[in-house]
Regions:
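Gly/Pro-rich, tryptophan- and cysteine-flecked surface segments typical
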Residues: 1-200
Length: 200
């Protein structure tokens, strides 16, 4: 059983359940709610969850993988962001703690040079910060690189960036705990053919 506010959905053993327009389902709404939030999915059994953010104009989907409570940390690295050409970056930072705190957000170039910084941004208990156009909101453009988010005051955080275009295409980059790097990693798939290429 998966519990949501006022909702309980049964997922078959080894199966999958898709909930279309989940925001409307949770609020018993028949039309657009205008709500922005993060979702918590809780279950009696171990689960994996993902969401597809679908552009209502182009029907273009972007996949977003869930993060567990254990993914929270005090320093998070979002591997990529961009404000160059047609690409923009939205950023969301979630406070997983039941008390308020602050975060400092830093963007660095590929050479490690600081190119943007937001100091001591307040974030409520179990709340979130959302920047629809992170760099545009700072008056910056023509840059790209990783984003670091540092939690202050003992809170645990997660962060995700979405690189997107006004035409509707987009992709998610989920933050990782900076302290959990590895000396060897595996990329599950790489392709180089007439239809696709792989950048690393």
């Amino acid at each position: 059983e998966i519990a949501a506010p006022g909702k309980q959905i049964t997922v078959p053993a080894y199966g999958m359940t898709q909930i279309n327009n989940v925001g409307r389902v949770l609020e018993d709404a028949s039309s657009i709610t205008g709500r922005e939030a993060y979702l918590i999915v809780e279950s009696e059994q171990e689960i994996r969850a993902w969401a597809s953010q679908i552009d209502n104009l182009t029907e273009d989907p972007s996949m977003e993988r869930s993060q567990s409570d254990a993914d929270g940390s005090q320093r998070v690295l979002v591997p990529s962001s961009a404000a160059i050409g047609q690409f923009l970056t939205s950023l969301i930072v979630i406070n997983q703690s039941d008390f308020a705190g602050q975060v400092t957000i830093r963007s660095r170039s590929n050479a490690g040079v600081l190119q943007a910084e937001l100091l001591n941004q307040s974030i409520e208990a179990n709340g979130f910060l959302h920047f629809a156009d992170f760099y545009g909101g700072l008056g910056l453009s023509n840059l790209y690189g990783p984003i670091e988010v540092e939690a202050l005051g003992g809170i645990q955080i997660t962060a995700t960036a979405r690189i997107y275009t006004q035409e509707g295409s987009s992709g998610y980059f989920q933050g990782v705990d900076i302290s959990k790097g590895s000396k060897k990693v595996v990329m599950p798939f790489s392709v180089d053919n007439d239809d696709f290429r792989t950048n690393l």
